[in-house]
Swiss-Prot record:
Protein name per the record: Profilin-4
SUPFAM superfamilies cross-referenced by the UniProt entry: Profilin (actin-binding protein)
Protein family (similarity comment): Belongs to the profilin family.
Post-translational modification: Phosphorylated by MAP kinases.
Disulfide bonds: C13-C115
Involved in PIP2 interaction (motif): residue ranges: 81-97
Principal location listed in the UniProt entry: cytoplasm
Annotated function: Binds to actin and affects the structure of the cytoskeleton. At high concentrations, profilin prevents the polymerization of actin, whereas it enhances it at low concentrations.
Other comments on record: The variability of the residues taking part of IgE-binding epitopes might be responsible of the difference in cross-reactivity among olive pollen cultivars, and between distantly related pollen species, leading to a variable range of allergy reactions among atopic patients.
Pfam family, one: Profilin
Alphabetical keyword list: Actin-binding, Allergen, Cytoplasm, Cytoskeleton, Disulfide bond, Phosphoprotein
Length: 131
């Protein structure tokens, strides 16, 4: 299965008539493996800061998580494995795998819990596959 198929079929999937606003799979080096058409244009330093927070949990808390110029308030995640952010009625979930970061961005009516399930389920599967 191509990386784009993982984004299209697993991340941008229909959940009770709703779906993520945007999604992507990005390598630890900041290279885009696959993304939805709606995923924001991001800066390399934004991905570098996210990677740093996985290595040093809590480093994003004072400044927030920035992606494509949007600032998300960092909320409880799983240190070294999952970062969650909130902005207004939406937010972001980032799951780290061995080689990549899985991004899911959502807005109401999709819930934070639904976004977490979508992103973390694919991330866990990729971890099991050695990715």
């Amino acid at each position: 299965m191509s990386w784009q198929a993982y984004v299209d079929d697993h991340l941008m999937c229909d959940i009770e008539g709703q779906h993520l606003t945007a999604a992507a799979i990005i390598g630890h080096d900041g290279s885009v493996w696959a993304q939805s058409a709606t995923f924001p244009q991001f800066k390399p330093e934004e991905v570098a800061a996210i990677i740093k927070d996985f290595d040093e949990p809590g480093s994003l808390a004072p400044t927030g998580l920035h992606l494509g110029g949007t600032k998300y308030m960092v909320i409880q995640g799983e240190p070294g494995a999952v970062i969650r952010g909130k902005k207004g009625a939406g937010g972001i979930t980032v799951k780290k795998t061995g080689q990549a970061l899985i991004f899911g961005i959502y807005d109401e009516p999709l819930t934070p819990g639904q976004c977490n399930i979508i992103v973390e389920r694919l991330g866990d599967y990729l971890l099991e596959q050695g990715q």
